[in-house]
Every structure is written in structure tokens, then in C-alpha cells.
Curated annotation (Swiss-Prot):
NAD(+) binds at G220, A221, G222, V223, I224, G225, V226, E227, E243, V278, G314. FAD binds at residues 71-80, 89, 154, 183-185, 355, 361-364. SUPFAM superfamilies: FAD/NAD(P)-binding domain, FAD/NAD-linked reductases, dimerisation (C-terminal) domain. It comes from Cricetulus griseus. Binds 1 FAD per subunit. The modification N6-acetyllysine is found at K66, K122, K132, K143, K346, K410, K417, K420, K505. The record marks D448, Y473 as: Important for interaction with PDHX and activity of pyruvate dehydrogenase complex. This is Dihydrolipoyl dehydrogenase, mitochondrial. One of its GO terms (biological process) is 2-oxoglutarate metabolic process.
């Protein structure tokens, strides 16, 4: 695909844009007009500037397309950058430092501190500073790549037309050859519970609390629930997560990893009520919240009182008022836009990627789809293997996985073998005094091919990318076991687990 990109870019720069086969035949290129009171003409118009949208816009421009990106919010970056992935990682990182300094960890390392105080306002400032810098980075990349940014709510008003309406009611019309919907997702509301982003909050409000709650109840122990719950638990809150399912970590996590993960979080002070459903929440006159819960299968009701209630039951595609109904584009039962393997809707020049289509709601999945989609518009190959898309939970320790879990392999009737290696036997983990967790590798019994990798431990989110590469290239467990890994590193645990899977046992355990 890289070679195609270079050829296409070269041809575009030489003025051969309209002479090559790229799916836009018969339509001449018209120079962009960026005056606010005049229409804009474009080759590609992207609706949404989240990870999928902004990456797609930049890639389209790099391929020679005249590109417009419409964003309804005042800032670029979508949920991920503004109120999701990025600010949450800032708080996870800084709360971890505070937890180490405030607890016994530093003292055990010979670092004695006389007084440790939390300045929550300063911590929030650092988070906001990182977000602001990255938003500015996207704006710079748009300018550098000549992507036209239009502020307003984008609605498809014709097969080749998008209208962006600003908050003041003014609008701008974009005439376009191709339209790419990348509008992302929004928080799924909980029936009967109204979010005010003050004491009853979504993930957005949980990233900007003014003080550490004495007691926090989290509805949902999936990825977002355990991440944000961990932040406030480290900073001093008494945190209880109520989960309808019987495990923590959400959909896709390996059950053995989940059980060990839950044990470690409980050791840190995180409390869980599994197989439990929330039936309602009532605000009291003193400002506290009574959360009513009962067993998922039904049973005796119980009330948990808290200062802040965090609702984390997932996200849903954002497709409202995009003009899809008028175009005859129907949604599937889960509210997603149906697309083919080239991300085309039933109208061939209208595409959709990211959270609005099927697949995991992950920023990096949307980014991949964005790049691949616009390469397809330019006539290139379209390939994505969703089995090779990694998932990460950014707690401490981290959890990461890619490929199949044991449960999935059993369900599919695939014979497999398992290789495991604990971080307690890893030299670098020992020197770091950070040994919780393990690496678990699943290989095909007959071929030794890597089928899945599941990591619980320090640096799991980085290590899983080696596993994703192995899966993408069809590597065997022996292939990885025979790659020399630097010593001492945490990634040696990944090699050792593959040794165990391929040869029956590791070296250092």
C-alpha cells in the first residue's frame, strides 16, 4: 500500500489526478473556495474529526484529494482527544504517581517523603494542557496537509452535498464527490437515571470532578469503568463497581486474565459487585445518592449510598440528524451504518468508518479504517483483519489482548495449546518491584500459529503490539521464541510465553 501511495502522490503532483483510475472518473477537479459565504467544492468531505475522521482527512489530502473535514464541536479531535482516551490517560498516569508516593511503595524503594499532598486543580491543568497541545497538533497537520476545516454540524443534504450548520444558524454548503461519515459515538444513557455531569456523571464528567468523592459508585466494570474507577480510588475515593456480568474487563477479555485482574484491583482497594444490576438511583436532600441494586437474576434489593455516581454502560453510534433517512440509508438493529468491505454504504460514494459501523469502538480501529477507506477511494487495496486489532485497559497493571481468547477457541472448536509466563519471574519486573501479572499465549495445536495473546502486567499496552504484528504476519509461537529480545526487558516475558507454547516450557520459570 505504501508503494501505491507514493505513486498516487507523485501523479497528483504532476497534474495527472484526473487521468488515473481512482473512482472519480468523469468529474473535473475544481479549486477549493474557502470563503464563508460561498460553497466549497471538494473531492472528499469527512464528517467528524475524531481519530478516524482526522486521520482519514489527512490521508486523503496526502493522496491528492481536495479534502474538507467538518467538525460540530469547537475543537478538533472528537471524543477520544477531548473527553476520552487522552484526558483519561493523563489522569491515570498522574494518579498512579500519587498512589505510589502516598502509599508505602516509595518508602520500600528508599524514597522517604515527609508530606504528600494532592493538588487536584494542578492535576487537571496538566491533563488540559496535554489535550490542548494535541488539539493544536491536529490543526497544524490540517494546515500542513491543506485539509480545509469547516466548523458546524454536518448533514448530508444530497448525494454529493454536505451542509455544515454553525451554532448561530449560519451554514456552509460543500459540494463533494465523496462523503465519509466518521461521527463516532456517544454515551449510552441508563434508563431512569439522568446524568447532570455534577454528581451523576458520565465518563465526561468523571474526567473533571472538582474534588475527590468520599464514595464513588460505578455502573459497569468494563474498560471505562475500571479505568476511571481506578483514577479516583488511587486519589482516595472508596470505589464500588456494579457489574451485570460475572467478570470485570468487559467483552473480549480472557476469563483467566479477568479473574487475576479482579484480584489485583481488589488488593488495591477497588470493590466489585458482579452479577448485579442497578434498578435505580435517587438523589437525597443532603446531596448524596442512593443507588438501588439487586442480583442480576433477581433477588433481595440493596441500597448503596455514594457522593458521586458514574454511569459507564457503554457507548452508542452517533448518527442523529445526518440526513441518512432522507437518503434511504437504514441503520442496523444496533444503530450502526451498514457498509461493505470497502466501507461504502448503499450509496457508493458515501462511506462510513469507526464507531458508526460494526466492530469494536476503538480509536485505533477507526484510524485504520480511515486510512484504508480513502486508499480504497483512490483505487487501492482494502484490507483489515479485525482479529488483529488489539484492546488495552490502561489501569495498573495494564491489561491487553489481541486475537482469540480461550473461550472463543473452545466455542469455535479449534484445538489449541497454551504458553504462560509470570512477570514475577521476569528480571526487569523484579528490578522494578512491579511483578503482578502474566503473559498468556494461545497457539494452534497443529501448526503452532499464534492465535491469541493476553497480557496482564506492566507495559502490557506496549507489548501487545508485538503480538498484533505476529498475528498480522501469521507468525508461529516458535518464530517469536527465536527472536532475540533485549535483556533485561519486560518483553522477554512475551518471548518466554511463546517458548512455553511452542516447546512446552519456558527457560526462566
Amino acid at each position: 500500500m505504501q508503494s501505491w501511495s507514493r505513486v498516487y502522490c507523485s501523479l497528483a503532483k504532476r497534474g495527472h489526478f484526473n487521468r488515473i483510475s481512482h473512482g472519480l472518473q468523469g468529474v473535473s477537479s475544481v479549486p477549493l473556495r474557502t470563503y464563508a459565504d460561498q460553497p466549497i467544492d471538494a473531492d472528499v468531505t469527512v464528517i467528524g474529526s475524531g481519530p478516524g475522521g482526522y486521520v482519514a482527512a489527512i490521508k486523503a489530502a496526502q493522496l491528492g484529494f481536495k479534502t474538507v473535514c467538518i467538525e460540530k464541536n469547537d475543537t478538533l479531535g472528537g471524543t477520544c482527544l477531548n473527553v476520552g482516551c487522552i484526558p483519561s490517560k493523563a489522569l491515570l498516569n498522574n494518579s498512579h504517581y500519587y498512589h505510589l508516593a502516598h502509599g508505602r511503595d516509595f518508602a520500600s524503594r528508599g524514597i522517604e517523603l515527609s508530606e504528600v499532598r494532592l493538588n487536584l486543580e494542578k492535576m487537571m491543568e496538566q491533563k488540559s494542557s496535554a489535550v490542548k497541545a494535541l488539539i493544536g497538533g491536529i490543526a497544524h497537520l490540517f494546515k500542513q496537509n491543506k485539509v480545509v476545516h469547516v466548523n458546524g454540524f454536518g448533514k448530508i443534504t444530497g448525494k454529493n452535498q454536505v451542509t455544515a450548520t454553525k451554532a448561530d444558524g449560519s451554514s456552509q454548503v460543500i459540494g463533494t464527490k465523496n462523503i465519509l461519515i466518521a461521527t463516532g459515538s456517544e454515551v449510552t444513557p441508563f434508563p431512569g437515571i439522568t446524568i447532570d455531569e455534577d454528581t451523576i456523571v458520565s465518563s465526561t464528567g468523571a474526567l473533571s470532578l472538582k474534588k475527590v468523592p468520599e464514595k464513588l459508585v460505578v455502573i459497569g466494570a468494563g474498560v471505562i469503568g475500571v479505568e476511571l474507577g481506578s483514577v479516583w480510588q488511587r486519589l482516595g475515593a472508596d470505589v464500588t463497581a456494579v457489574e451485570f456480568l460475572g467478570h470485570v474487563g468487559g467483552i473480549g477479555i480472557d476469563m483467566e486474565i479477568s479473574k487475576n485482574f479482579q484480584r489485583i484491583l481488589q488488593k488495591q482497594g477497588f470493590k466489585f459487585k458482579l452479577n448485579t444490576k442497578v434498578t435505580g438511583a435517587t438523589k437525597r436532600s443532603d446531596g448524596k445518592i442512593d443507588v438501588s441494586v439487586e442480583a442480576a437474576s433477581g433477588g433481595k434489593a440493596e441500597v448503596i449510598t455514594c457522593d458521586v455516581l458514574l454511569v459507564c454502560i457503554g457507548r452508542r453510534p452517533f448518527t442523529q440528524n445526518l440526513g441518512l433517512e432522507e437518503l434511504g440509508i437504514e441503520l442496523d438493529p444496533r444503530g450502526r451504518i451498514p457498509v461493505n468491505t470497502r466501507f461504502q454504504t448503499k450509496i457508493p460514494n458515501i462511506y462510513a468508518i469507526g464507531d458508526v459501523v460494526a466492530g469494536p469502538m476503538l480509536a485505533h480501529k477507526a484510524e485504520d479504517e480511515g486510512i484504508i477507506c480513502v486508499e480504497g477511494m483512490a483505487g487501492g487495496a482494502v484490507h483489515i483483519d479485525y482479529n488483529c486489532v488489539p484492546s488495552v485497559i490502561y489501569t495498573h497493571p495494564e491489561v491487553a489482548w489481541v486475537g482469540k481468547s480461550e473461550e472463543q477457541l473452545k466455542e469455535e472448536g479449534i484445538e489449541y495449546k497454551v504458553g504462560k509466563f509470570p512477570f514475577a519471574a521476569n528480571s526487569r519486573a523484579k528490578t522494578n518491584a512491579d511483578t503482578d501479572g502474566m503473559v498468556k499465549i494461545l497457539g494452534q495445536k497443529s501448526t503452532d500459529r499464534v492465535l491469541g495473546a493476553h497480557i496482564l502486567g506492566p507495559g502490557a499496552g506496549e507489548m501487545v503490539n508485538e503480538a498484533a504484528l505476529a498475528l498480522e504476519y501469521g507468525a508461529s509461537c516458535e518464530d517469536i521464541a527465536r527472536v532475540c529480545h533485549a535483556h533485561p526487558t519486560l518483553s522477554e516475558a512475551f518471548r518466554e510465553a511463546n517458548l512455553a507454547a511452542s516447546f512446552g516450557k519456558p527457560i526462566n520459570f
